[in-house]
Design a protein with these regions (language model features):
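C-terminal auxiliary extensions adjacent to catalytic cores
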Residues: 1-184
Length: 184
């Protein structure tokens, strides 16, 4: 049709971005796993009495599930094409589907990072009286303004929502930057 509206370049970029973000979330989940597994001097599942309570086990499960969902969402949309418009459009980029999948991967990654944030904040409490760097302590303070230290099992919905908001808004980076100066 010579409309020059073929979306393949955008579709390729969106698919590639989704793959990169999914990998980033996967690395975050692995760090979360290491915080809850009890092998680094931290209590298993980040609760003092974790044998009777599941602690941060379920949030880590949720993060692992989101990482697995992202893997399935990362099949490139741009490699799928079906003729449309009575064959006039013989190669379709599927870029709109790629954009929707990329958005879902981003949303899942934000939640995975939020779980890591919750676990990291909890783990810092077990290392006291030691202090982390100024930027980490500032970010920890921003987390603790919205999410309390856990001593027992409770539902995580409100905490996860608060942590996701902190990740999505950039508030944690902003808090750290108040101590460190601008971050890249």
């Amino acid at each position: 049709s010579a409309g020059n509206f073929h979306g393949q370049p955008l579709a390729l970029a969106l698919d590639t971005a989704a793959i990169a973000i999914a990998e980033w979330a996967s690395i975050s989940e692995r760090r979360t796993y290491l915080l809850v597994d009890g092998s680094d001097g931290l209590p298993p599942f980040l609760l003092e009495r974790s044998g009777l309570q599941s602690g941060f086990m379920i949030p880590q499960y949720a993060a692992a599930a989101l990482v697995s969902e992202n893997k399935t969402l990362c099949h490139p949309a741009c490699v799928d094409s079906i003729p449309s418009s009575r064959g006039q459009e013989d190669h379709v980029s599927m870029g709109a589907w790629g954009a929707r999948k990329a958005l879902r991967v981003i949303e899942n990654a934000e939640r995975v990072l939020a779980v890591e944030v919750l676990c990291a904040a909890q783990s810092l409490e077990f290392r006291r009286p030691l202090r982390a760097g100024r930027g980490v302590e500032a970010a920890h303070g921003a987390i603790r303004e919205r999410v309390a230290y856990r001593t027992e099992d409770l539902t995580f919905e409100a905490d996860l929502t608060a942590a996701t908001d902190l990740v999505r808004s950039g508030a944690l980076v902003a808090a750290a930057a108040t101590e460190t100066g601008p971050l890249p």
